[in-house]
């Protein structure tokens, strides 16, 4: 099941504060990942276009995130649960009734209703078997002689270093 919560409509104070902390680049981190104090003198003071782009991507991502674990779960009452169960079962019944023709088909195609007569009949003449073998050999030969000639390169380089 999915979540129908939209962050654009309702924001709690805690959500706004979390977003503000995520989006506020002026608050420096307290510690580096390795536990050492960060060196602020080595950071460049001017933001580049790339950093501005990354910040805007981060802002868009943070505004579009839906925290499913923080969303209040809407519990269903017993009658709502039973109504949904009935609704789903009627939908399944409608869908399964349209697929009943698949259940009626035999697992293997039936060429005859009396296979014992086919098995007891005369075998296929040897000349017919030879003719089918020759036709299959000609078809195999024709297929094996199919060639694709390259007229131009498949991959073209665009002079990118």
Swiss-Prot record:
Q: What is the protein's membrane topology class?
A: Lipid-anchor
Concerning PTM, the database record says: N-terminal myristoylation and palmitoylation mediates its recruitment to lysosome membranes, thereby promoting localization of the Ragulator complex to lysosomes. N-myristoylation by NMT1 is required for palmitoylation at Cys-3 and Cys-4. May be palmitoylated by ZDHHC3.
Q: A single Pfam family, by name?
A: LAMTOR
Question: Any keyword GTP-binding?
Answer: no
Q: What is this protein called?
A: Ragulator complex protein LAMTOR1
What InterPro entries does UniProt report for this protein, alphabetically? LAMTOR1/MEH1
Task: Name the UniProt key words of this record, in alphabetical order.
Answer: Endosome, Isopeptide bond, Lipoprotein, Lysosome, Membrane, Myristate, Palmitate, Phosphoprotein, Ubl conjugation
Where can the Glycyl lysine isopeptide (Lys-Gly) (interchain with G-Cter in ubiquitin) cross-link be found?
20, 31, 60, 103-104
Role played = Key component of the Ragulator complex, a multiprotein complex involved in amino acid sensing and activation of mTORC1, a signaling complex promoting cell growth in response to growth factors, energy levels, and amino acids. Activated by amino acids through a mechanism involving the lysosomal V-ATPase, the Ragulator plays a dual role for the small GTPases Rag (RagA/RRAGA, RagB/RRAGB, RagC/RRAGC and/or RagD/RRAGD): it (1) acts as a guanine nucleotide exchange factor (GEF), activating the small GTPases Rag and (2) mediates recruitment of Rag GTPases to the lysosome membrane.
Naming one, the record's GO cellular component terms include: lysosome
The Gene Ontology biological process terms listed for this entry are: cellular response to amino acid stimulus; cholesterol homeostasis; endosomal transport; endosome organization; lysosome localization; lysosome organization; positive regulation of MAPK cascade; positive regulation of TOR signaling
Q: In the record, which residues receive a covalent lipid, type N-myristoyl glycine? A: 2
Q: What are the recorded GO MF terms, alphabetically? A: protein-membrane adaptor activity
Cell compartments where the protein resides: Lysosome membrane; Late endosome membrane
Q: Which SMART domains match?
A: LAMTOR
Q: How does it assemble?
A: Part of the Ragulator complex composed of LAMTOR1, LAMTOR2, LAMTOR3, LAMTOR4 and LAMTOR5. LAMTOR4 and LAMTOR5 form a heterodimer that interacts, through LAMTOR1, with a LAMTOR2, LAMTOR3 heterodimer. Interacts with LAMTOR2 and LAMTOR3; the interaction is direct. The Ragulator complex interacts with both the mTORC1 complex and heterodimers constituted of the Rag GTPases RagA/RRAGA, RagB/RRAGB, RagC/RRAGC and RagD/RRAGD; regulated by amino acid availability. The Ragulator complex interacts with SLC38A9; the probable amino acid sensor.
Q: Where is the lipid attached (S-palmitoyl cysteine)?
A: 3-4
Domain of life the protein comes from: Eukaryota
What ranges does the record give for the region Interaction with LAMTOR2 and LAMTOR3, renumbered to this chain? 121-161
Quick check: keyword Ubl conjugation in the entry?
yes
Question: Mostly located where?
Answer: membrane
Give the family per the record.
Answer: Belongs to the LAMTOR1 family.
Q: What are the start and end residues of every segment in region (Disordered)?
A: 1-43
């Amino acid at each position: 099941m999915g979540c129908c919560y939209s962050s654009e409509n309702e924001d709690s104070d805690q959500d706004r504060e979390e977003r503000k902390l995520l989006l506020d680049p002026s608050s420096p981190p307290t510690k580096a990942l390795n536990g050492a104090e960060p060196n602020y003198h080595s950071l460049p003071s001017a933001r580049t276009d790339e950093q501005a782009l990354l910040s805007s991507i981060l802002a868009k991502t943070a505004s579009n995130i839906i925290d499913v674990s923080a969303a209040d779960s809407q519990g269903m009452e017993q009658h709502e649960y039973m109504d949904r169960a009935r609704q789903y079962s009627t939908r399944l019944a409608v869908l399964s009734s349209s697929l009943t023709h698949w259940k009626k088909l035999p697992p293997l195609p039936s060429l005859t209703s009396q296979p014992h007569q086919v098995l007891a009949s005369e075998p296929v003449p040897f000349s017919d078997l030879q003719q089918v073998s020759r036709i299959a050999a000609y078809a195999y030969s024709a297929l094996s002689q199919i060639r694709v000639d390259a007229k131009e390169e498949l991959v073209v380089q665009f002079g990118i270093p």
